[in-house]
C-alpha cells in the first residue's frame, strides 16, 4: 500500500488544484510519488505513458511536468536528449520544516 505524507493531502492538493488551478499537476505528482515509493527509485516514464496513466492528453501531461519542475516538486534527468526522463519526487516541505524546527 502506498503511503502519502499528510502534507500532500492537507496542503499540496489545495495549493495545486485550488490556488494554481492545475489539477493535472496534482494527479501527475500523486502517480509519480506512488510509483517512486513502489520502485524505491526515480520513475522512468514517457509523456505518452504518463498521460495514459493519469487519463489526460500528452500535452496536459507535459504541462503538468513542467509546472511540477518549476515548483521544485519533481526533478528530471535524462541520459541523453532523446532518452525517457527519470522523475524524482521532491518533498521541499520536509526540508523547510527541518530548517525551522
Residue spans of the language-model regions?
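Short recognition helix of helix-turn-helix/winged-helix DNA-binding domains
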Residues: 1-53, 82
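Key DNA-contact positions within bacterial/archaeal DNA-binding proteins
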Residues: 59
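Winged-helix/helix-turn-helix nucleic-acid-interaction surface
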Residues: 62-101
Amino acid at each position: 500500500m502506498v503511503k502519502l505524507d499528510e502534507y500532500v493531502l492537507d496542503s499540496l492538493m489545495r495549493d495545486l488544484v485550488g490556488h494554481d488551478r492545475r489539477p493535472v499537476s496534482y494527479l501527475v505528482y500523486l502517480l509519480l510519488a506512488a510509483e517512486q515509493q513502489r520502485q524505491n527509485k526515480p520513475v522512468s516514464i514517457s509523456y505518452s505513458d504518463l498521460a495514459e496513466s493519469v487519463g489526460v492528453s500528452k500535452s496536459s501531461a507535459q504541462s503538468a511536468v513542467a509546472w511540477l519542475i518549476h515548483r521544485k516538486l519533481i526533478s528530471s534527468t535524462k541520459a541523453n536528449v532523446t532518452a525517457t526522463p527519470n522523475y524524482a519526487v521532491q518533498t521541499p516541505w520536509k526540508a523547510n520544516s527541518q530548517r525551522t524546527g
